From Swiss-Prot:
<feature type="transmembrane region" description="Helical">
    <location>
        <begin position="3"/>
        <end position="23"/>
    </location>
</feature>
<feature type="transmembrane region" description="Helical">
    <location>
        <begin position="450"/>
        <end position="470"/>
    </location>
</feature>
<dbReference type="Pfam" id="PF14849">
    <property type="entry name" value="YidC_periplas"/>
</dbReference>
<comment type="subunit">
    <text>Interacts with the Sec translocase complex via SecD. Specifically interacts with transmembrane segments of nascent integral membrane proteins during membrane integration.</text>
</comment>
<dbReference type="GO" id="GO:0032977">
    <property type="term" value="F:membrane insertase activity"/>
</dbReference>
<keyword id="KW-0472">Membrane</keyword>
<keyword id="KW-0143">Chaperone</keyword>
<dbReference type="Pfam" id="PF02096">
    <property type="entry name" value="60KD_IMP"/>
</dbReference>
<dbReference type="InterPro" id="IPR019998">
    <property type="entry name" value="Membr_insert_YidC"/>
</dbReference>
<dbReference type="GO" id="GO:0015031">
    <property type="term" value="P:protein transport"/>
</dbReference>
<feature type="transmembrane region" description="Helical">
    <location>
        <begin position="558"/>
        <end position="578"/>
    </location>
</feature>
<dbReference type="InterPro" id="IPR001708">
    <property type="entry name" value="YidC/ALB3/OXA1/COX18"/>
</dbReference>
<comment type="function">
    <text>Required for the insertion and/or proper folding and/or complex formation of integral membrane proteins into the membrane. Involved in integration of membrane proteins that insert both dependently and independently of the Sec translocase complex, as well as at least some lipoproteins. Aids folding of multispanning membrane proteins.</text>
</comment>
<dbReference type="GO" id="GO:0005886">
    <property type="term" value="C:plasma membrane"/>
</dbReference>
<feature type="transmembrane region" description="Helical">
    <location>
        <begin position="376"/>
        <end position="396"/>
    </location>
</feature>
<dbReference type="InterPro" id="IPR028053">
    <property type="entry name" value="Membr_insert_YidC_N"/>
</dbReference>
<keyword id="KW-1003">Cell membrane</keyword>
Length: 627
């Protein structure tokens, strides 16, 4: 080859290279051509499938190829994932055992290893057919495909983790990665994808999610357990709220973003936490048949941020476990206030001051006592003594006031004898003279109510605490097998109208003892504080009526709560009796007589009362003049 030939070939090569370089397509054109090719192939596949399906219908045959075409017509690129064999994948640690299914790639069963049902059976939060988790996939060709209908392949499997893979083809897939935390009730779930540009729309930024669960009955009293069963949810960076636990059916549509949603019963919960947020939330619950094996049917649907085309991931955390207050609070340690999960609000402790008492006084005290005592009967006794000791200084003032009223009773009876009439004028004079006596002696007629008023917030706080604390669940004391439920010493199966509905088909002994002790408390305190006024006679039956109502109301409640109220009443009576020995009534009477000779400044309350009496007397006289 001569020199000129070589030069010519080089020049030709340079010309060809230069022409190719100058006329090369830009990256956008290449991507557009690739998408066009994919779309053309997809449309061609659809056309072929429809043609085969039409031919099969015409010929009356259904060969495998026609079934595949029909599957493609419904599921598109995911048609291949509709065929497969369902397989169970087990994950476990020391606290829970989970079963996941390759069909849908979701959790099918949750067993809590440390807990039993009321009748001693293994405690499952749900089993096969009782829970459903679904990601409706909206594809680029406007199909809506449910992951519950598709088969996933388990990869990277260990005893505590697995990746469920939904394959589109060899290079395109959707992954659900599960990791069970060691010695914990939490399960991490990550949703991610690879090369899914051909599956999802170009403008996709949110993914749909559906979750449902039939909440199983775990405790002895269906009615009482159902009262604490509901859907709870937390607004992103805000407070925790819930659906009504008393309505037969309830539902809400929430546009505000949510951080988590929970299906909870009295002592256990299933919680789904989104690391980002849920939007377009729809929550619904419906109460199951009374006395059945289920409490409520709960469902949620929402959307969450996800763009799998760009390789982003959506992270979630499932919590399947007991509602132990201190454990749930510990999940927020080290977090910023706005990032707190506030899962401790799943334990209902009341509102305002009652929650404050439980959170900062009762729970720390009971936690401390559990370090030294294992018997909850003893712990409740010590809690009761502690509360009584805490309010004893102020309660003493109440007992002192009751003693004053008791010592002044003969003088009040003299006033009643002086103005015996039942007409309005006599009643006004009698009331005015009695108030003047109390004011002169330095006694307050309402001060005797102070002990009850002081312990009232604690009584309400305990009413919120005992039925919801899992610490007393299946803890026995004396004849009570479970302090979190009623202690039936006698029961029957026949349905007695009204009685069975409002009282139940059993007799709770601690409830009965509570009622008896409350009657003793009422009789003793009313006898000590009775002033002899007619108004007292009119009101003396009210506490007894209330006690009978409580007998019906608490018969199906936690026996631990009734035991606390029983102790509280007995200790209060003992305090009253002890005050008779502590307070020197002779010295107190001398002090009252001395007070009568001293000039006393009227209290604002007494001044207003006397002013009201004067106005009432003036109106009465005007009415008499008109007559």
């Amino acid at each position: 080859m001569d020199k000129n030939t070589v030069i010519g070939l080089v020049l030709i090569g340079l010309v060809i290279f230069g022409f190719s370089w100058l006329n090369r397509p830009d990256p956008q054109e290449i991507e557009a051509q690739r998408k066009a090719a994919i779309e053309a192939a997809r449309q061609d596949s659809i056309a072929k499938a429809e043609a085969e399906l039409l031919a099969a219908r015409t010929q009356g045959a259904t060969p495998d190829s026609i079934k595949q075409a029909a599957g493609y017509n419904q599921y598109g690129l995911l048609a291949a994932a509709t065929a497969g064999a369902e397989e169970q994948v087990e994950l476990a640690n020391g606290k829970i055992a989970l079963k996941l299914s390759t069909k849908g790639g979701a959790i099918r069963e949750v067993l809590l290893r440390d807990y039993k049902t009321h009748d001693g059976k293994p405690l499952y939060l749900f089993r096969e057919g009782e829970s459903d988790f679904n990601l409706p996939l909206r594809t680029v060709d406007n199909r809506l495909v449910d992951t519950r209908d598709l088969y996933f392949s388990p990869i990277s499997r260990t005893d505590s983790s697995v990746v469920m893979r939904l394959a589109v083809d060899s290079a395109s897939y959707l992954d659900l990665a599960y990791v069970l935390l060691p010695d914990d009730y939490r399960l991490r779930m990550t949703v991610s994808g690879q090369n899914l540009q051909s599956l999802f729309p170009a403008n996709m930024t949110m993914q749909d999610l559906e979750w449902s669960q039939r909440i199983r009955r775990q405790e002895k009293s269906w009615k009482f357990e159902n009262q604490y069963t509901s859907i709870y949810y937390k607004y992103s960076g805000d407070e925790v709220d819930r659906l009504s636990d008393s309505k037969q059916e309830d539902k809400k549509t929430l546009e505000e973003p949510l951080h988590w949603v929970s299906f909870k019963d009295k002592y256990f919960a299933s919680v789904l936490v989104c690391d980002s947020y849920f939007e377009n939330n729809k929550l619904a619950q419906k109460t199951a048949a009374a006395g059945s094996d289920y409490l409520k049917n709960c469902t949620m649907s929402a959307t969450f941020p996800l763009d799998v085309r760009s390789g982003t991931k959506a992270r979630f955390t499932f919590f399947f476990g007991p509602l132990k207050y201190n454990m749930l609070r510990a999940y927020d340690k080290g977090m910023k206030a706005e990032d707190n999960l506030d899962l401790d609000h799943l334990v209902y402790l009341g509102a305002s001051i009652f929650r404050w008492i439980n959170r900062y006084m009762i729970i720390p005290a009971s936690t401390f006592l559990q370090q030294y005592f294992s018997n909850w009967g003893l712990i409740i006794l010590l809690l009761t003594l502690g509360i009584k000791l805490l309010i004893s200084p102020l309660a003493y003032k109440g007992y002192l006031s009751s003693a004053k009223m008791r010592l002044l009773r003969p003088q009040v009876q003299e006033i009643n004898a002086k103005y015996p009439g039942k007409d309005q004028e006599s009643m006004m004079k009698r009331q005015s003279a009695t108030m003047n006596l109390y004011r002169a002696a330095g006694a307050g007629p309402m001060s005797g109510c102070l002990p009850m008023l002081l312990q009232f917030p604690f009584l309400i706080a305990m009413y919120m605490y005992f039925p919801t604390t899992i610490d007393i669940r299946q803890q026995s004391f004396l004849w009570a097998e479970d302090l979190s439920s009623y202690d039936a010493v006698f029961s029957w199966t026949a349905d007695i109208p009204l009685l069975s509905q409002f009282y139940g088909n059993h007799v709770s002994l601690f409830c009965l003892l509570m009622s008896i002790s409350n009657i003793l408390y009422i009789r003793y305190t009313m006898n000590q504080s009775d002033t002899g006024q007619e108004g007292m006679a009119m009101l003396k039956w009210m506490p007894y009526i209330t006690t009978v109502m409580f007998l019906f109301f608490f018969n199906q409640n936690a026996s631990g709560l009734c035991y606390y109220y029983f102790l509280s009443s007995i200790i209060t009576v003992i305090q009253y009796m002890s005050s008779r020995f502590i307070i020197n009534e002779e010295k107190l009477m001398a002090k009252l007589e001395a007070n009568k000779t001293k000039p006393r400044k009227k209290s604002k309350w007494m001044a207003r009362l006397e002013e009201a009496q004067r106005q009432q007397e003036a109106m009465r006289r005007q009415q008499q003049k008109r007559k």
